[in-house]
A protein has these predicted regions:
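Short, solvent-exposed loop/turn segments at the edges of secondary structure
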Residues: 78-82, 145, 312, 325
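Short alpha-helical functional segments enriched in proximate histidine and acidic residues
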Residues: 20, 106-110, 287
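Short glycine-biased active-site loop of nucleotidyltransferases that positions the nucleotide triphosphate
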Residues: 41, 74, 306-309
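A gly/proline- and charged-residue-enriched helix-loop-helix capping module
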Residues: 79-126
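Conserved acyl-donor/pantetheine-binding loop and adjacent beta-alpha core of acyl/acetyltransferases
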Residues: 65-84
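Aromatic (often tryptophan-rich) hydrophobic motifs at membrane interfaces
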Residues: 50-52, 92, 97-104, 224-334
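Short, high-confidence coil segments that cap the C-terminus of an alpha-helix
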Residues: 44-46, 110-112, 290-293
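A conserved beta-strand-loop-helix scaffold within acyl/acetyltransferase catalytic domains
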Residues: 4, 8-54, 58-70, 121-270
Length: 334
């Protein structure tokens, strides 16, 4: 324990942090300071931490401090989908425990009385490191919430003809992926990456979708444009077009070399009969598979910390041969 030093991140550590995350065993786009920087200054009270052992950087933790009533909470950075500790190499269990203890000690010394965070999905790890979860249980952390996300293994679709890929999907139930994809192909639907001039139209469709579901976007139009500027290769927008008109769109983030995360999928409902979201997701799977990626994560289909399942949304995702992965929220009073 005495060998560990916790340093609060500042801009002078930017290059060190970036290099560490990119070379780590479990870092993602959402752990990079470059990504976190798109948020307006002052939106969050940043408390990202760097953990050193004998002057060697061992782990980093993107985080912020929240004021909840009369108590301060250290939380996985609220500006990301997931966070948690990032390690440079496969850590031994003792090192994981020591790092968590060091974070707790830092928190207590700064009048922080609770620690909450969520790890990245295991599909984005370069190697399994379940010793992190094991250490959390050993140290008294609780699984506060568990969300169910859907992911797609892509290797099966790599370098095969479109028609052969279509045959791999179900053709029964409500979604009828095989039938609807073939129908879209016959109708001449176009799938392609959007250019920057088309982002406004995409966002207009997205807002209309969210209003239908009484929801609000996590990103403003300016946010999406800024992220696209920061990461021109790792933030992509794809559209599906019917007779030249944008009918659906997907915003995806390149999490790391393992795969991508769908942040928003949306559809112009006047084209619903053409099933543009079905065709769009099918072509996303094919595109990313042919580029050599392992997984596409479609995001959660649950609400209220996993207590409520959106069965219609989950049915759509599972009809594309999707499988469930757990996103766990850990917490502990200090």
């Amino acid at each position: 324990m005495s060998n560990y030093t916790v340093v609060k991140y500042s801009s002078e550590h930017y290059d060190e942090w970036q290099d560490f995350v990119r070379m780590s065993v479990n870092g993602t786009l959402f752990h990079e300071q470059k990504f976190l920087s798109y948020h307006d200054e002052g939106k969050f009270e940043d408390c990202s931490l760097m953990l050193y052992c004998k002057d060697e950087l061992i782990a980093v933790l993107p985080a912020a401090v929240l004021q909840r009533g009369d108590r301060k909470v250290l939380k996985s950075h609220p500006g990301t989908s997931y966070g948690g500790l990032v390690f440079g190499t496969i850590p031994k269990l003792k090192a994981v425990i020591d790092c968590i203890n060091a974070v707790e000690e830092y928190a207590r010394n700064n009048n922080i009385s609770r620690f909450e965070f969520r790890q990245a999905p295991k599909i984005f790890l370069s190697t399994p490191i379940d010793q992190i979860d094991f250490a959390l249980v050993q140290l008294g952390y609780e699984r506060e919430d568990q969300e169910l996300s859907t992911c797609y293994p892509l290797i099966e679709y790599r370098d095969i003809p479109i028609e052969d890929m279509v045959k791999l999907f179900e053709n029964d139930g409500r979604n009828k992926v095989r039938k609807n994809v073939r129908k879209a192909i016959r109708a001449g639907l176009e799938f392609r990456e959007l250019d920057n001039s088309e982002i406004d139209k995409y966002y207009e469709i997205l807002l209309d979708n969210l209003v239908r579901h009484e929801a609000k976007p996590a990103h403003s139009l300016a946010d999406i444009k800024k992220l696209k500027e920061l990461y021109p290769e790792r933030v992509r927008l794809y559209g599906v077009f019917v007779a030249g008109n944008m009918a659906a769109g997907y915003l995806i983030f390149n999490i790391n070399s393992n795969g991508w995360h769908v942040f928003y999928g949306s559809m112009d409902y006047k084209y619903q009969v053409e099933r543009p979201t079905t065709f769009g997701l099918f072509m996303l799977l094919k595109t990313l598979a042919d580029e050599g990626y392992e997984y596409l994560n479609m995001g959660i289909s649950t609400e209220d910390g996993g207590r409520v399942v959106n069965w219609g949304l989950l049915d759509f995702k599972e009809s594309f041969n999707g499988t469930g992965i757990i996103r766990t929220y850990w917490s502990k009073n200090l």
